[in-house]
Curated annotation (Swiss-Prot):
Main location: membrane
Lineage: Eukaryota, Metazoa, Chordata, Craniata, Vertebrata
Region (Extracellular domain (ECD)): 402-611
Organism, as annotated: Oryctolagus cuniculus (Rabbit)
Residues bearing the modification Phosphoserine: 9, 28
Protein name (Swiss-Prot/TrEMBL): Solute carrier family 15 member 2
Entry's Gene Ontology cellular component terms: apical plasma membrane; phagocytic vesicle membrane; plasma membrane
Length: 729
C-alpha cells in the first residue's frame, strides 16, 4: 500500500494541483437521485432484488429437497437412476450460467435477461408440478413432463445466477462501496435463508399432506413454483427504480477467443526460422491488446489450480442424493421431533450460517495467534480433508445400517416365514433339498416363525413340497417360488383340517423410510379399509390377502373399516420408519374389528441423528473450501477477469456433479464402498492440490491491477504522483 494511503475505500486522499487555469465546464442537467432506504445510502431498488433472490432460492432449493424421493416414490426409479438424474440436473444448473452471462453481456443486458429467464423458470416449475399429478397420464407422461420441467428450471435458475447479484451491485454509486459490500452480505444471507426455510418446509408439504392417496408432491413442487412467481413479480415491481446498464460485451468469449487464437497461431508458425516467444499466449499479440494478454496469463495460473476442484463438489453435492437415500434407511424419531429423511438437508444451510462467523471470528484468529501461516490454499486443502472425513463417517453409518438390516436372498435363494392361523400348533417340514432342519420347531396358534429362514433352490424357480402335521393329520402341500424373493406361508383352518397359502411379501428392496402394510381377512365377508382420504384397500373374504400399500410413519389409532352392513374403526398403533406390517383381521364384534398385528420387516433401528457428524464435517469443509476459494481466486486475478473466474468456478461444480453421475451408473459398488471410494479419491486429489499449491507463487495485488484499477494523475511542479486503488468486491 502507498504510505500516503490510509483508506482503500476512498478514491484518493490528495487532489492533483495544477498551476494552469482550468477552463470552466458547462453545467449539465442534474441526474435524478434514486430513492433510498430510510434516508441511508442504500438504493430502494436493492430491496426488490434481495426479496427476489430469497424467493428464487426458496423455489430452487425447495423443489430440489424433495426431488430424489420424488424419483423413488413417485416415478419408482432405483437409487442409481435417481442419483444420476439428480446430479445431471444439478450439473445443468451450473452449465447454464455461462449461457445466461453471454446473453446478458452481449445481447439483452442483465435486467431483461433476469425477466425473460425467470419466466422460463416459472414455466418449468408449473410443468414440474403437473408431472406429480397421478391423474395426468401414466409413468411415461410423468417422466417426460418431469424432465422437460427440470430442463426449463435449469435454464432459468442457472441463467439468472450470474446476473442477479451483479445487477444489485450496479445499483450503487462508486462512492458507496462500503454499502455495496454490506449489500452482498445481505444478498448471501437471503440465499441461505431461502435454502434453510425451504428445505425444512417442502418435505413437510410432501409428507404431512396427502393428495391422490399418497404423498403430495404436486404441492411440494407447486409452492416453490408460487414463490418463483412472487420472485418475478417483486423484481418487476422495481423496474422504474433500477439502473439498467447496457450490455458491455462478453469477457468470457474474449478470453476464449484470445486463447484459441494464441494456440492456432502458434501451430501455424512452427518453423524453426520463426523466433520463439516467452509465453505461449504471446502468440495472440497480432490480434489482441497487450493488457488483455497479460490478464489472461494471470488468469490461466489460477485456472490451473482449479483442475482438482471438481472432486470436492462431487462429494459436497451428494447431500441431496446419496445422503438423503441413506436417511430413508434410518429412524427419524428424535423424541421431541420426527424428522423426514429429506429434512436432514436443512442442516447444511443452518450450519453454514453458524460456521462462517465461527471460523472468521474464532478459529482463524486462534490459529493466527499460534503463529501458523494459514494461507488460503492451506484452508482449501483442510476443507478437502474434512470432506474426506465426512464420507468416511457416512460409510461407517452405512455399514451399521447394513448390519441392522434384514438379510437379503441371493441367487437361487428365497426367504420364507410361516404364519399359523389355525387353532392349534402345527409342525412343518420342507421336504428334500436338506432344508427340513430350518423349521424344526412347532409353530403355535397365531404365532409365526421368529424370523425369515433362507431356503436354497436348485434352479431360479422351483416347486416346494411341505409336510404339515396338525393334531393327528398329515397334510402335504405344494407351492412354486422364484429366487430372490420373500415369501409367507400362511396356514389356515379348512373345516376340520388345515390348508396353506403361499404369498409373496415385499420385494427385496427398501421402502425408503415409508411403512408398508397389508391385511389378511379371515371373515366371511369383504372388508374395505380406508387409510386416508384417498387410500383404500379392499380385502376379500375367507383369507383374502390385500396388496401392500406404503404410508407415512405415524400413529393410526382409528382407521375406518367397512363391511357390507357395518362401519368399524381399527387401531393400527404406531407404524414406524421402514417397517413392513401384516394385519390379520380375526373377528368382528359390536366393539369393532379385531386384528393381529405382525411385523414382517423390523423398523429402521439406526437413528438419523448419526448423520449429524458427517453433515458437520462436510459443511465445515465447505466453509473452508468454497468461501476461501472464491476469496483467493478474486485476489489472484485482474478485476477484468472476475466474471471469467466466476464462470470457471461454476464449471467446476458442474463437472463435480458429472463425476457423481458416472460413478453412480458404472461403479457397481455397494453404498458404503462407494462412499469410501469418493473419500479416497478426494484424498488423492487433495495431495495433488497441496503439491500444486506448494509451488504456486501468489501474486501481489499491485501486480495485477489493470488500467481501470489505477489512477495516476499527471502532476506538475514538485508534486508527487500518487497511486490510488479502488475497492473491488
Amino acid at each position: 500500500m502507498n504510505p500516503f494511503q490510509q483508506n482503500e475505500s476512498k478514491e484518493t486522499l490528495f487532489s492533483p494541483v495544477s498551476t494552469e487555469e482550468t477552463p470552466p465546464r458547462l453545467s449539465s442537467p442534474a441526474k435524478k437521485t434514486p430513492p433510498k432506504i430510510c434516508g441511508s445510502n442504500y438504493p430502494l431498488s436493492i430491496a426488490f432484488i434481495v426479496v427476489n433472490e430469497f424467493c428464487e432460492r426458496f423455489s430452487y432449493y425447495g423443489m430440489k429437497a424433495v426431488l430424489t424421493l420424488y424419483f423413488l416414490y413417485f416415478l419408482h426409479w432405483n437409487e442409481d437412476t435417481s442419483t444420476s438424474v439428480y446430479h445431471a440436473f444439478s450439473s445443468l444448473c451450473y452449465f447454464t450460467p455461462i449461457l445466461g452471462a453471454a446473453i446478458a453481456d452481449s445481447w439483452l443486458g442483465k435486467f431483461k435477461t433476469i425477466i425473460y429467464l425467470s419466466l422460463v423458470n416459472v414455466l418449468g416449475h408449473v410443468i414440474k408440478s403437473l408431472s406429480a399429478f397421478p391423474i395426468l397420464g401414466g409413468k411415461v407422461v410423468h417422466t417426460v413432463l418431469s424432465l422437460v420441467g427440470l430442463c426449463l428450471i435449469a435454464l432459468g435458475t442457472g441463467g439468472i445466477k450470474p446476473c442477479v447479484a451483479a445487477f444489485g451491485g450496479d445499483q450503487f454509486e462508486e462512492k458507496h462501496a462500503e454499502e455495496r459490500t454490506r449489500y452482498f452480505s445481505g444478498f448471501y444471507l437471503a440465499i441461505n435463508a431461502g435454502s434453510l426455510i425451504s428445505t425444512f418446509i417442502t418435505p413437510m408439504l410432501r409428507g404431512d399432506v396427502q393428495c391422490f392417496g399418497e404423498d403430495c408432491y404436486a404441492l411440494a413442487f407447486g409452492v416453490p413454483g408460487l414463490l418463483m412467481v412472487i420472485a418475478l413479480v417483486v423484481f418487476a415491481m422495481g423496474s422504474k427504480m433500477y439502473k439498467k446498464p447496457p450490455p458491455e460485451g462478453n469477457i468470457v468469449a474474449q478470453v476464449v477467443k484470445c486463447i484459441w487464437f494464441a494456440i492456432s497461431n502458434r501451430f501455424k508458425n512452427r518453423s524453426e526460422d520463426i523466433p520463439k516467444r516467452q509465453h505461449w499466449l504471446d502468440w495472440a499479440a497480432e490480434k489482441y491488446p497487450k493488457q488483455l494478454i497479460m490478464d489472461v496469463k494471470t488468469l490461466t495460473r489460477v485456472l490451473f489450480l482449479y483442475i482438482p476442484l471438481p472432486m470436492f463438489w462431487a462429494l459436497l453435492d451428494q447431500q441431496g442424493s446419496r445422503w438423503t437415500l441413506q436417511a430413508t434407511k434410518m429412524n427419524g424419531n428424535l423424541g421431541f421431533f420426527v424428522l423426514q429423511p429429506d429434512q436432514m438437508q436443512v442442516l447444511n444451510p443452518l450450519l453454514v450460517l453458524i460456521f462462517i462467523p465461527l471460523f472468521d471470528l474464532v478459529i482463524y484468529r486462534l490459529i493466527s495467534k499460534c503463529g501458523i501461516n494459514f494461507t488460503s490454499l492451506r484452508k482449501m486443502a483442510v476443507g478437502m480433508v474434512l470432506a474426506c472425513l465426512a464420507f468416511a463417517a457416512a460409510a461407517t453409518v452405512e455399514i451399521k445400517i447394513n448390519e441392522m438390516a434384514p438379510p437379503q436372498p441371493g441367487s437361487q435363494e428365497i426367504l420364507l416365514q410361516v404364519l399359523n392361523l389355525a387353532d392349534d400348533e402345527v409342525k412343518l417340514t420342507v421336504l428334500g433339498n436338506n432344508n427340513n432342519s430350518l423349521l424344526a420347531d412347532s409353530i403355535k396358534s397365531f404365532q409365526k416363525t421368529p424370523h425369515y429362514s433362507k431356503i436354497h433352490l436348485n434352479t431360479k424357480s422351483q416347486d416346494f413340497y411341505f409336510h404339515l402335521k396338525y393334531h393327528n393329520l398329515s397334510i402335504y402341500t405344494e407351492h412354486s417360488v422364484e429366487e430372490r424373493n420373500w415369501y409367507s406361508l400362511i396356514i389356515r383352518e379348512d373345516g376340520k383340517s388345515i390348508s396353506s397359502i403361499m404369498v409373496k411379501d415385499m420385494e427385496n428392496e427398501t421402502t425408503y423410510g415409508m411403512t408398508a402394510i397389508r391385511f389378511i381377512n379371515t371373515l366371511q365377508e369383504n372388508v374395505n379399509i380406508s387409510l386416508g382420504t384417498d387410500i383404500s384397500l379392499n380385502v376379500g373374504e375367507n383369507y383374502g390377502v390385500s396388496a401392500y400399500r406404503t404410508v407415512q410413519r405415524g400413529e393410526y389409532p382409528a382407521v375406518h373399516c367397512k363391511t357390507e352392513d357395518k362401519d368399524f374403526s381399527l387401531n393400527l398403533g404406531l407404524l414406524d420408519f421402514g417397517a413392513s406390517y401384516l394385519f390379520v383381521i380375526t373377528n368382528s364384534t359390536k366393539q369393532g374389528l379385531q386384528a393381529w398385528k405382525m411385523e414382517d420387516i423390523p423398523a429402521n433401528k439406526v437413528s438419523i441423528a448419526w448423520q449429524l457428524p458427517q453433515y458437520a464435517l462436510v459443511t465445515a469443509g465447505e466453509v473452508m473450501f468454497s468461501v476461501t476459494g472464491l476469496e483467493f481466486s478474486y485476489s489472484q486475478a485482474p478485476s477484468s477477469m472476475k466474471s471469467v473466474l466466476q464462470a470457471a468456478w461454476l464449471l467446476t461444480v458442474a463437472i463435480g456433479n458429472i463425476i457423481v453421475l458416472v460413478v453412480a451408473q458404472f461403479s457397481g459398488l455397494v453404498q458404503w464402498a462407494e462412499f469410501v471410494l469418493f473419500s479416497c479419491l478426494l484424498l488423492v486429489v487433495c495431495l495433488i492440490f497441496s503439491i500444486m499449491g506448494y509451488y504456486y507463487i501468489p501474486i501481489k495485488s499491485e501486480d495485477i491491477q489493470g488500467p481501470e484499477d489505477k489512477q495516476i494523475p499527471h502532476m506538475q511542479g514538485n508534486m508527487i504522483n500518487l497511486e490510488t486503488k479502488k475497492t473491488k468486491l
